[in-house]
Each structure stands twice: as structure tokens, then as C-alpha cells.
Regions:
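ABC-type nucleotide-binding domain
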Residues: 1-240
Length: 240
């Protein structure tokens, strides 16, 4: 599968080929401009592949009605988007039919329940437009919770835990892995430490997939991944 943006002289992605099984956690890592966001944008059809195809459950994504695809795939971007209202009203954008129990379950998984419970009004605590009255980490956790409220088949986290400390990031990944059912999670991250326990890690470099495997395998077989990991380890960023 390849992707060339309209008007671009060269492809942003070339010869990408992988299979993600239901229930797996897939890590995506690479340097700036390597194609990470381009890759995950093909799953919900923000863009369409110019060569090859992306399939969900054996069916090309182009064959899904967009409304059905949006119900199957939830994307959480690095820049959290919150609306003026309350915590509850923001979460209900994930599903208008969600009960309070559903909201709290999503908050627990997203590691947001504790700070919401500490608010005087809990779920009814006011949220300013853009979440101006919340910290970066709180906003990211609420947007992850909102995505979970919709009960998607595929959850894409595009560097959306970047404002979380390592302990909270690790707790989030553990909670996602423990969810019942067959949720497939794509984690795009600059932190190799965030992907160490993924079932598969896709390593991108200049729009090409230069590595695919588990953490230990890639340390042995993929120079690009090894370089990323070791550079972060030396800085104290790559932790178990």
C-alpha cells in the first residue's frame, strides 16, 4: 500500500504491508516526517491509499459507508479537542446513549476517573471551550475516555498520551490491554518505552516500513528502531 498526497512529487508512504489481528496492540514509531500520522490516517479514511488498499475484517475501507466506519474506528489526536460544556457533555460525544456507568468505565480505563471524582461537580464539572481550565494531561485522558465511550472496534492513539507521565502512560496501556472483547489499538508514539509490550511494532523511516515485530526482535533486526531506543535510553526516556 502506498500514499501520495495530491500535488506532492514523491509518495509519503511506499510499500506498506502488515496485518493487525483483532485484540492486538500495534505500535507505530519513527522519526519526524517518517509517515506515522499518514499511515494511521488511512484506516478511518481521512485519506485513501493511492496504491493498494486498507481492509477491516477483510473488507476494503472504501466499501464501508463513512458513518459505519466512524463507528468502528475512533481516533484520538495529540491535540485534545474539548468543547465548552461539562465533562459529561464532552464524553457523550462518544455516544449519546451512554449511561453514567459507561462514562465512569471509560474514565477508569483512560486514567481520568480519579481527577474527575476530585472535581466538586464530578461529571457535571464545567469545561471551558478547548478545555482551557484543564491541564494537558487531563485533556488527553478525557479525549481518550470519549473515544472509549463509543465502544469502537479500532482505537487509534496518535501521540495522544504525550502529556502523560510514564506511570500514567503505562497504567493506560495496561488498562487498554485488559479490556474485554477484541479492541484493536494502534499507538503512535515518539517513546519507544510506550511500545515495548505491543504485539507488533511498525517502524517507519522516510515513508517506508523498515521494521515489523516485537520490541526484543526489533532491537536485534532493525537498526532504525535500535537507534531510537538507545538514544532515548541514554536520556533516561526508555523505561520498562
Amino acid at each position: 500500500m502506498s500514499l501520495t498526497y495530491k500535488g506532492a512529487g514523491a509518495p509519503s508512504l511506499s510499500d506498506i504491508n502488515f496485518t493487525a489481528k483483532r485484540g492486538q496492540t500495534i505500535g507505530v514509531i519513527g522519526g519526524t516526517g517518517s509517515g506515522k500520522s499518514s499511515l494511521i490516517s488511512l484506516i478511518p479514511r481521512f485519506y485513501d491509499a493511492t496504491e493498494g488498499s486498507v481492509e477491516i475484517m477483510g473488507r476494503p475501507v472504501r466499501q464501508y459507508p463513512r458513518v459505519d466506519l466512524r463507528g468502528k474506528v475512533a481516533v484520538v489526536m495529540q491535540k485534545a479537542q474539548l468543547f465548552g460544556g461539562t465533562i459529561r457533555s464532552n464524553l457523550l460525544w462518544g455516544s449519546q446513549n451512554a449511561s453514567d456507568a459507561d462514562l465512569w468505565a471509560a474514565l477508569e480505563t483512560a486514567q481520568a476517573a480519579e481527577f474527575v471524582k476530585a472535581k466538586p461537580l464530578g461529571l457535571d464539572e464545567p469545561v471551558e471551550q478547548g478545555g482551557r481550565n484543564l491541564s494537558g494531561g487531563q485533556k488527553q485522558r478525557l479525549t481518550i475516555a470519549r473515544a472509549l465511550v463509543g465502544k469502537p472496534d479500532i482505537l487509534i492513539l496518535d501521540d495522544s498520551a504525550s502529556a502523560l507521565d510514564y506511570a500514567t502512560d503505562a497504567a493506560l496501556r495496561k488498562a487498554l490491554a485488559a479490556l474485554p472483547g477484541d479492541l484493536t489499538v494502534f499507538i503512535v508514539s515518539q517513546r519507544a518505552a510506550s511500545l515495548q509490550h505491543a504485539d507488533q511494532i511498525i517502524v517507519l523511516d522516510d515513508g517506508r516500513m523498515v521494521g515489523l515485530g516485537r520490541h526484543a526482535e526489533l532491537l536485534e533486526s532493525c537498526p532504525v528502531y535500535k537507534e531510537i531506543y538507545e538514544s532515548q535510553f541514554k536520556k533516561g526516556d526508555a523505561q520498562k
